[in-house]
A protein has these predicted regions:
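Accessory beta-strand-rich segments of carbohydrate-active enzymes
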Residues: 1-61, 86-87, 102, 228-231, ...
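Extended substrate-binding grooves/exosites of carbohydrate-active enzymes
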Residues: 8-14, 34, 47, 53-57, ...
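Non-catalytic, glycine-rich low-complexity segments
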Residues: 16-18, 22, 26-91, 163-168, ...
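Short, hydrophobic beta-strand segments
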Residues: 14, 126-135, 507-512, 604-624, ...
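Accessory carbohydrate-binding/adhesion or oligomerization-edge regions at the termini
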Residues: 22-30, 50, 102, 395, ...
Length: 797
């Protein structure tokens, strides 16, 4: 597999050995070559499954069950099931699909018999008709299930449940985007896949945490940039109601990359959240005939597998070239280029358009002064890249154009790498609406005020903890609200009242005076919202806030816990930077720490992290089992905080534990038989293939007119063996035996019976010469009936 973002499936049946033989799965990861220009991470960072299947089975992602509207009241799910027969003979079976309502009740069932030849695929088509289903939407993400079973002789041999949703989508050249017949604006974000403390190895629960923060901000769509994401992320978008622009990693039409594209479409085409495919991001060939031809071919690959969704390409140039890829897609995709929106629309009035990436505004959470010498960006939405726009300008450009379907802001969260516009020692980006931990920046409340309609929003920035020499000096104050107007007060005195500008929001210049800065929001002349920032006292106590009250004790569930300090009145101190130390007891472990500071070089693994503008995060993950989990956070001079979270007993997730790979010794040679006891330490030439004969485990040696035989094998010790020795396990060793290693007797078996036998050996720095001197009665069989493995004393990291 030549992509770090796509899955691969390998049938290991031809390579597996059975019984006591050792099967070792080794995966070599080579991350020398970059796929992206951000910090991508490396290794096996998503789930890996060992799957046992019947010979006739449903292939992975082999059920296509995406509903299609037929009439105003009638829908069809053209269920297509792909089977594979790994057996040696033709297999006959029956495929049964059942549509389950959101409450689990069966709605309809279809059956089809089919016969699949050995090592071939078979396809069953079982269309299901549905009348007046409930619709999937961001506000009400209703999911149905298609249960698919394979039966042979009345017995279920394979079963898969596939979630799906009923919804219609349409991109219109004049009116933008329509979902279920309703004209809505896409309010989207882009993001990479890493989080503070864990990098790209993000636990499933953290995906839910991140998406929940976005939903609260008013987001209804997410562009997976610029690669396929984890399957669990897509499932969370389905269940939480977040539409997805599903983008591939590499723009290439060679067979390997077409295979990757096919895998992505096959995996995600059942997701109701997916509203649009994107076949590339900002490719240099976007304004060339070659680029058009490549997109045409990728377009065809996608449409063959999913004819129901439109396709775009995220262009950042080439829009006005004679040949450009907008000519080969269903929806034109703009990355930035705000100034070209109107001209392009005039020249291409029949092409639906969306912004596929915009913004690239820059902020440091908690900072309110830009200082390039310190790699700091202010939080007033004044800074952006040369190619981008501020949050306010970018949204206004989309919101005021009805033919523009929507936007996808760069980015939802900060991410490791790409510290534009700075360089080292900055180690993460400034683009995020939230920081690496998911702590909101000012932009979060700005978009919440612009996008949330079902609740009142009012936030004030900045904090009100300024040094004494700031008294009397003007402080820029912003109110972020969806009210009609906002009144600002300082220490009870009205400063002014302003009508809310839904794009620019409201700004004041307020001479600093310690105390309480308060904002009041009005709609239709009535107070609908209040908020305040206060000058706090010095911190006196640490405070911990868990994201949830419990963890599933499955060894996978995880949660972020917010760390802060409060003053004597329990108020958050927004300027604190105390170093925190964490201790944890119970069935859990700390898997990461962070604070959202793009210039911080503290380790993201361990039990310490400083606050950054009053906040830090510690991420814990459950172990298997149940019981109380207790976390304590402390810092010198302040009262520590302790919380207890319960790990709940849940059914264990089927898994195979990672073990030390035992070294299998399977290249043995046997000496000539003898009636007298031979010298087990005598020199033997490695190339002596005349007097010594190859033997294998499982085959005993009959002592014809003899009583002794020597078995010999050599091996190069692992590093752990070199440092502290190990053990050798003989499975079903038959006959009396002396075990010699490098000329030293390390163990003796004194019985003739067949049994497992283990010997320990000391640290061995060089190549090891292992000999087994076997002794038995003439005419009996002795030897290695099972395998022989060399094991370490500890886990190899």
């Amino acid at each position: 597999n030549w992509c770090g973002y796509t899955s691969m499936y390998i049938d290991i049946t031809p390579y597996a050995t059975y019984g006591d033989d050792v099967n070792t799965i080794a995966v070599r990861v080579d991350a020398d070559a970059q796929e992206g220009w951000w910090y991508e991470g490396a290794g096996i960072y998503r789930h890996t499954w060992l799957v046992k299947r019947s010979p006739l089975h449903i292939i992975t992602d082999g059920v296509f069950a995406h509903p299609v509207k037929k009439t105003e009241s009638q829908w069809e799910i053209p269920v297509e099931v792909s089977l594979y027969n790994s057996g040696k003979l033709t297999a006959d079976g029956e495929v049964e699909v059942t549509l389950l309502a959101p409450d689990g009740q069966p709605i309809a069932t279809k059956n089809q018999k089919l016969s699949v030849k050995a090592l071939r695929e078979g396809i069953a088509n079982l269309p299901i008709t549905v009348t007046k289903p409930l619709f999937w939407s961001p506000e009400n993400p209703v999911l149905y299930k298609v249960k698919t079973q394979v039966k042979q002789n009345g017995t279920v041999t394979d079963e898969v449940e596939t979630k799906c949703g009923f919804r219609t989508i349409r991109f219109d050249n004049n009116t933008g985007f329509w979902l279920n017949g309703e004209n809505i604006k896409i309010k989207g974000v882009c993001s990479h896949q890493d989080h503070a403390g864990v990098g790209v190895a993000v636990p499933d629960a953290l995906w839910e945490f991140r998406l929940r923060k976005l939903k609260e901000m008013g987001v209804n769509a997410y562009r997976v940039a610029h690669n396929p994401v984890a399957k669990e992320f897509m499932a969370a978008c389905d269940s939480m109601g977040i539409m997805v622009l599903d983008e591939n990693r590499l723009f290439n039409t060679s067979p390997e990359y077409v295979r990757q594209l096919e895998w992505q479409v096959r995996r995600d085409r059942n997701c109701p959240s997916v509203i649009l495919w994107s076949v590339f991001n900002e490719e240099p060939m976007q304004g060339t005939e070659n680029g058009v031809e490549m997109v045409r071919r990728m377009y065809d690959v996608v449409k063959k597998m999913d004819p129901t969704r439109p396709i775009t390409a995220a262009m950042n140039g080439g829009f006005f070239s004679e040949y450009n890829v907008s000519q080969a897609v269903d929806v034109g995709g703009f990355n930035y280029q705000i100034e070209s929106y109107d001209c392009f629309h005039e020249e291409n009035p029949d092409l639906p358009l969306t912004s596929t990436e915009d913004g690239s505004a820059l902020m440091t959470r908690g900072e309110y002064v830009t200082d390039y010498s310190k790699n700091l960006m202010d939080s007033y939405d004044t800074q952006c890249t040369g190619w981008g726009a501020t949050h306010r300008r970018a949204w206004k450009a989309v919101a005021e154009r009805p033919w523009m379907a929507g936007c996808f802001y760069w980015t939802a969260f900060d991410y490791h790498g790409e510290p534009t516009p700075h360089r080292w020692p900055t180690v993460s980006s400034f683009f995020g609406i939230m920081d690496l931990c998911g702590f909101p920046k000012m932009a979060y409340y700005l978009h919440q005020a612009q996008w949330v309609k079902d609740k009142d929003v009012l936030e004030l920035v900045p904090h009100w903890n300024w040094p004494a020499d700031s008294i009397g000096k003007p402080i820029k104050v912003m109110a972020l609200s969806n009210a009609d107007k906002v009144k600002l007060l300082l220490n009870g005195k009205v400063i002014s009242e302003q009508a809310v500008d839904p794009y620019e929001m409201n700004t004041w210049s307020v001479p600093y005076k310690p105390g309480k800065l308060e904002a009041i929001g009005y709609k239709n002349g009535k107070i609908v919202s209040r908020t305040k920032v206060e000058t706090t006292k010095d911190p006196v106590q640490v405070h911990l806030t868990p994201d949830r009250n419990s963890l599933a004790g499955d060894g996978r569930d995880a949660m972020p816990i917010t760390v802060e300090v409060v003053d004597s009145k329990g108020r958050h101190v927004p300027t604190a930077n105390n170093m925190m130390e964490f201790t944890l007891t119970g069935p859990a472990e700390i898997i990461g720490v962070g604070n959202g500071n793009p210039n911080c070089h503290e380790p993201e693994k361990g039990n310490k992290r400083s606050l950054f503008y009053g906040l830090a995060q510690v991420i814990i993950q459950s172990k298997e089992g149940s019981g109380p989990i207790t976390l304590t956070a402390s810092t010198p001079g302040l009262k520590p905080a302790t919380i207890t979270i319960n790990a709940e007993q849940v059914p264990p997730i089927p898994s195979i534990a990672a073990e030390n790979p035992p070294m299998l010794l399977n290249r043995w040679v046997a000496s000539p038989l003898s009636t007298e006891k031979p010298d087990a330490t005598r020199q033997i030439a490695d190339n002596d293939m005349n007097s010594w004969q190859p033997v294998s485990g499982g085959n005993l040696i009959k002592l014809e007119n003899a009583n002794f035989v020597i078995l010999r094998a050599t091996f190069n010790p692992y590093q752990a063996h070199q440092e502290e020795g190990g053990s050798i396990l003989f499975k079903q060793l038959t006959g009396k035996a002396e075990i010699w290693l490098n000329g030293q007797l390390i163990g003796s078996k004194t019985t003739d019976k067949e049994e497992d036998f283990t010997v320990e050996f000391p640290a061995a720095k060089e190549r090891c010469d292992l000999r087994v001197l076997l002794n038995g009665t003439t005419g009996e069989a002795v030897g290695l009936k099972g395998n022989v493995t060399v094991r370490t004393k500890r886990m190899i990291p």
